[in-house]
UniProtKB/Swiss-Prot annotation:
GO-annotated molecular function: N-acetyl-gamma-glutamyl-phosphate reductase activity; NAD binding
Family per record: Belongs to the NAGSA dehydrogenase family. Type 2 subfamily.
Enzyme nomenclature, EC number: 1.2.1.38
Protein name (database record): N-acetyl-gamma-glutamyl-phosphate reductase
EC category name: oxidoreductase
Recorded name of the encoding gene: argC
NCBIfam families in the cross-refs: argC_other (TIGR01851)
Assigned keywords, A-Z: Amino-acid biosynthesis, Arginine biosynthesis, Cytoplasm, NADP, Oxidoreductase
Active site: 117
Recorded GO CC terms: cytoplasm
Reactions mediated catalytically: N-acetyl-L-glutamate 5-semialdehyde + phosphate + NADP(+) = N-acetyl-L-glutamyl 5-phosphate + NADPH + H(+)
Cellular localization per UniProt: Cytoplasm
Lineage of origin: Bacteria, Pseudomonadati, Pseudomonadota, Betaproteobacteria, Burkholderiales
Major localization listed first in the record, in broad terms: cytoplasm
Length: 315
């Protein structure tokens, strides 16, 4: 049986480079690349996409839509790392752990849209609680997240790493118009009736995300406790290879969250911090924006689509 072929369209961007690095040396697939002079040639790109078993799109949204339009071969399967198709009903959302059986849905999908980095953490925290009836669909969700500057893409990396480090701003809060492009994605896949309030920021470090969601217990169904929220998440992710829920007893000793703690991995760590006296809970997610938030998730989805679970586990 011949090896499946994988073509990365946009393999010189931040995510594309990391996916290429993760796949380099794999003996269970053939990684197709174009010469430098042909990487932006639409004719050669279209040929490579249509000749691949799976094409991974690491492109800006408009270019990703264009690349999908190149497809004439009905056998080609696609993983899109852009945000172009994340709310489209005919694309499978590429977060394997978000629902029971969803990994199998991805495994058999023709079109998979890779989650955004921030939505990965927000949906991981909110969706299981909403599905269990512990978090009302109309809860006024507020999300804050800090990412390493690599979340801004190649231009942001160059700006931080090629200039005078002393001029780098320690923290840049953005999305102040409350219209970040990830909001519809979070709302849809977390099962929320209303748009969540989302305030992101970039820190003066390369990669890693810490995302938090404050919860007022008085706004939840009567009798719901922080312990129940934790139990729900712990149960949902009990068998997940790449998502871990910190034991409730351990959170009492945690005084800070390090956004860089899981850098270089495809893992995500969730936490539930409970203040029963004040009726408040803080949900948290820590993960690598370039790992579980991008390239790691894409490779995880690729392995599911290839039926290469053993290879994924070994990696």
């Amino acid at each position: 049986m011949s090896q499946p072929t994988v073509y990365i369209d946009g393999d010189q961007g931040t995510t594309g480079l990391l996916i290429h690095e993760r796949l380099r040396g794999r003996i269970d697939l053939q990684l197709v690349t174009l010469p430098d002079a042909e990487r932006k040639d639409p004719v050669r790109r279209a040929e490579a996409i249509n000749a691949a078993d799976i094409a991974i799109l690491c492109l800006p949204d408009a270019a990703a839509r264009e690349a999908v339009g190149f497809i004439r071969n009905p056998a080609v399967r696609v993983i899109d790392a852009s945000s172009a198709h994340r709310t489209q009903p005919d694309w499978v959302y590429g977060f394997p752990e978000m629902a029971n059986g969803h990994a199998q849905t991805i495994a058999h999908a023709r079109r998979v849209t890779n989650p955004g980095c921030y939505p990965t953490g927000a949906i991981a925290l909110l969706r299981p609680l909403q599905q269990a009836g512990l978090l009302p669909r109309d809860y006024p969700v507020s999300i804050h997240a800090v990412s390493g500057y690599s979340g801004g893409g190649r231009a942001a990396v160059d700006a931080f790493e090629s200039g005078d480090a002393s001029q780098a701003k320690p923290l840049q809060v953005y999305g102040l118009a409350l219209a970040h492009k990830h909001v519809p994605e979070i709302q849809l896949h977390a099962g929320l009736t209303n748009r969540p309030m989302f305030v992101p920021a970039y820190g003066a470090y390369r990669q890693g995300i810490v995302l938090t969601v404050p919860i007022e217990l008085r706004l939840l169904p009567a009798g719901v406790t922080g312990e129940q929220l934790h139990a729900c998440l712990a149960h949902h992710y009990a068998d997940a290879r790449h998502v871990d829920v910190t034991p409730l007893a351990d959170t009492q000793a945690i005084t800070h969250l390090d956004p860089q703690a899981l850098n270089g991995t495809n893992d995500m760590r969730l936490g539930v911090f409970v203040n029963a006296e004040h009726g408040q809970v803080l949900l948290s997610a820590v993960f690598d924006n370039l790992g579980k938030g991008a390239s790691g998730a894409a490779v995880q989805n690729l392995d599911l689509m290839l039926g290469a679970a053993d290879v994924a586990k070994a990696a």
